[in-house]
């Protein structure tokens, strides 16, 4: 069987199916974490790494041939913005609405109103929260936690189009190897591969996303 299913309008059926399975895994992992039953799905966070790989696969297949044929970096960024930002905005605003509702019903259960609003505005712009609180901890995106992975994916997209899109395979292999070594170090240091969602592990997410994304590009 081919590694990809039948292709329709450059969409791979098999990858779309795996994308859906991974999304469900991430959702179940977050639900399990909230219910303190994460032991039932201890490695569900690895679905995020699959998304990083998938992003590299899709972007390389969809855009590599277009550079030099009328598409430049600005056009690429605009296309990605149109593709991704509606989801960012919807998630951040929905999370903000939930926190505001909690504030109205039980103010003590959420942060002060000013901090809730600041977090909502920053997260809606895909900007990590620069400080935390006793209630939200050190989360980068307290209004919509999963946005952290999209933030790092966007960074990978920008780095790829600015630095790597026209580079040959040997250089990409070097980048992959360096990222793998750094990622392995971070896993050993933190005792887990589940890094990147808070300020304590912010920099550890960089080799994590780089390894997955570049691996996808090479595929």
List each language-model region with its residue ranges.
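Functionally critical transmembrane alpha-helices in membrane proteins and complexes, commonly lining
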Residues: 10-66, 82-92, 207-208, 213-214
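Aromatic-enriched alpha-helical transmembrane segments of multi-pass intramembrane proteins
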Residues: 16, 70, 115-219
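Aromatic-anchored segments of alpha-helical transmembrane domains
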Residues: 24-31, 97-100, 178-191
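Active-site alpha-helix of zinc metalloproteases
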Residues: 25-26, 75, 148-149
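Membrane-interface helix termini and inter-helical loops of multi-pass transporters
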Residues: 37-40, 104-109, 191-199
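Transmembrane alpha-helical segments and their boundary/interface "anchor" motifs
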Residues: 45-48, 52, 64-125, 156, ...
């Amino acid at each position: 069987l081919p590694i990809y299913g039948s292709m329709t309008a450059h969409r791979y059926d098999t990858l779309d199916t795996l994308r859906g399975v991974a999304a469900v895994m991430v959702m179940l992992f977050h639900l399990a974490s909230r219910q303190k039953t994460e032991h039932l799905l201890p490695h569900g966070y690895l679905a995020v790494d699959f998304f990083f790989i998938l992003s590299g696969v899709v972007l390389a297949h969809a855009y590599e041939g277009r550079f030099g044929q009328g598409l430049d970096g600005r056009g690429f960024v605009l296309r990605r913005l149109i593709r991704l930002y509606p989801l960012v905005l919807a998630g951040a605003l929905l999370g903000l609405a939930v926190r505001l509702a909690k504030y109205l019903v039980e103010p003590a259960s959420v942060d002060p109103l000013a901090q809730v609003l600041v977090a909502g505005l920053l997260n809606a712009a895909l900007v990590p929260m620069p400080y935390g609180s006793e209630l939200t901890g050190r989360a980068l995106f307290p209004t919509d936690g999963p946005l952290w992975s999209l933030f790092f994916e966007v960074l990978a997209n920008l780095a790829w189009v600015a630095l790597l899109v026209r580079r040959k395979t040997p250089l990409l292999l070097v980048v992959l190897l360096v990222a793998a070594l750094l990622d392995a170090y971070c896993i050993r240091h933190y005792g887990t591969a589940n890094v990147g969602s808070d300020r304590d592990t912010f920099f550890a997410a960089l080799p994590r996303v780089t390894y997955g994304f570049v691996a996808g590009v090479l595929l």
